[in-house]
Amino acid sequence: MDYLRAQVPGGELVSASPQEISPTVKRVVDDLAPHPTFVRTASMDIIYWNTAATEKIFDWSTLHVEQRNSLLLMFGYDGYQQRIENRGCAARHTVASFRTTFALSKSKARFSEILTALSASSAFQTLWQEMHVEKIGQGEKVIRNARGEQVNYRYVSLEVENSPGIFVICYLAM
């Protein structure tokens, strides 16, 4: 556990709802357009996004609130999976990041719901058994937009200060 705590400054995480995102954070996300940017909780629920994210990555508004989760989409929604090139690498990273925030979270209820929903996925179970941990951090990803065009992105995940478990993730086209 000490290793995990060292990976995420600030210690334990809590989950948040869209109502708990400050107007300032929402404005920052909106003003980052044309760069796809969204807000994600420690449990990987997508709770806010800008129009560029809808147009260039995915339209989360088409899903019920409880389905707007990066991990659930990665392993259970073909329309989302087909957009991500090198899905295996992206899935491994997402599972490792989820494991880290799960271990650090004060509230396990949402994490448990997600784990239960993914229990039938053999692909998820294989990665979960690897016991790998890491932070979202920054990296590169290739995403196909709604028109099928392949776009190379660099992304960065930034935790909102004084809002443990709230991350702003911004994608910059390369």
Positions of PLM-derived features:
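Short amphipathic recognition helices of helix-turn-helix/homeodomain-type DNA-binding modules
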Residues: 1-20
